[in-house]
Amino acid sequence: MPLLDPNTQTLAESSAAQPQRLPFPPVTYSHILHCSYHQWQPRYRTLTPKSRAIPLTPSFVSYLRANGIVLPPETTRPHGDDDIDTFSDDGADEESDPSVEWQEIHSQIKSTISEFGGKVTPKLNWSAPKDAVWMSATNDLQCRTPNDIYLLLKSSDFITHDLEHPFDGCVPDPDDSSEAPATQPDIPYYLVLRKYVNFNPSLEFRCFVRNRVLLCMCQRDQNHFDFLFSLRDTLRSRIQAFFDEKLKDTFPDPNFVFDVYIPEPHQRVWLIDINPWADRTDPLLFSWLEILQMKDPIGIKEEDTDAPEESFVRLSLNGATPTVVEVNRDEDSESEKDVGSADDGDDSPFLPEFRLVKRDDPEAYSFSTPQYSAHKLPKEVVDASLAGSGGMSEFLGKWQDILAKQTQEDTDSDDGR
């Protein structure tokens, strides 16, 4: 039997102590549906920015799912008999207008853009096409025309996930007593158009709720903002009060993640989104393992009950995983003294950890770092897609010629060696 180097053995033991899979509770179909915008927004309408949810027809959903990017013409052709000769072009462009199958939705989008002052931001039931903003002239989600919206939706992997994989990793609800094999529920898809607001990204925060307890929170933008540290206590208090009064007892599930925006003067909290308690939701400044192993008041009480009378309970975890103390050790002590004091007294209120990007964090100055770069395509591919099926076929032909030429050159080079 070979001997292990002590360091290797320690590493192996550490790896063994780590769970092989994140210890999430089962994610049910209903939980995913509860986090769909059309499900939660009516309940919290007064807490959200102004928006409209447009029900989507099967033909429009099929358009989003279809390969290639074919956009409707910017101007609508007349359909009267008197105008046929004037605008006739032998029907060459008749098939190039995909909106003929969903004219009502197209008209609703136009009217909503006009109603909201000419600028909106789009999303589907769960996701906004943030990974496709590089396709936009403004490099954000701002849309002024229906075609701006269609271009973002059809260029986004996030939207594709909403359409094709919303229930990945999910299980049927435990109260489903049907003996028939569980089938995924039908999804009524919606296009959500929100009035465009130039949000200050430094004031957006993601909050994690477990067992109806606000467990922790962090900033969404991963750049350092020095002014946030002096506001940490105020913002934490605002978010905690908002959660206690508006969300704690009203959202159907005990575990979820929600996003808020708190603009100056930091008096009002706006609910921006609600996300599943699942690894598909980005934990941002935390890791999911770290969050799942955090203690909340319920876990602390259970630990107190199980502990012998002569022992004491420490807010730490066995093994090589981060402890509560270790997680907090990097936080600015001056800003987080109240969290430490809250843990010392039995009657002290539980305070969620509020994590901010510090000045010396490696990711603190990523202003020039492009987000979602893995989702981008070469400009030539995008241009070919915009030209329709013919443009893409021409591009593929040229690409194959280039590959064949490169292969031939490599072969000739090998033969001459």
Curated annotation (Swiss-Prot):
Which GO terms fall under molecular function for this chain's record? ATP binding; magnesium ion binding; protein folding chaperone
Q: Where is the signal peptide?
A: none
Q: Does the keyword ATP-binding apply?
A: yes
User: Where is there biased composition of kind Polar residues?
Assistant: 1-18
Q: Where is this region: Disordered?
A: 1-23, 72-96, 323-352
Listed binding positions for Mg(2+) are 273, 275
Entry's transmembrane regions: none
- Subcellular localization: Cytoplasm
In terms of superkingdom, the source organism counts as Eukaryota
Q: Which GO terms describe its cellular component?
A: cytoplasm
User: Which InterPro entries does the annotation name?
Assistant: CDC123 (IPR009772)
- Does the record carry DNA repair as a key word? no
Q: Which GO terms describe its biological process?
A: eukaryotic translation initiation factor 2 complex assembly
Compositional bias annotation for Acidic residues? 82-96, 329-347
Q: What does the UniProt keyword field contain?
A: ATP-binding, Chaperone, Cytoplasm, Magnesium, Metal-binding, Nucleotide-binding
Name the positions where ATP binds: 123, 126, 128, 130, 194-195, 204, 206, 220, 259, 273, 275
Summarizing the function annotation, the protein's role is: ATP-dependent protein-folding chaperone for the eIF2 complex. Binds to the gamma subunit of the eIF2 complex which allows the subunit to assemble with the alpha and beta subunits.
* Family listed: Belongs to the CDC123 family.
Query: In its UniProt entry, what is this protein called?
Result: Translation initiation factor eIF2 assembly protein
What is the scientific name of the source organism?
A: Aspergillus fumigatus (strain ATCC MYA-4609 / CBS 101355 / FGSC A1100 / Af293) (Neosartorya fumigata)
GN (gene name) = cdc123
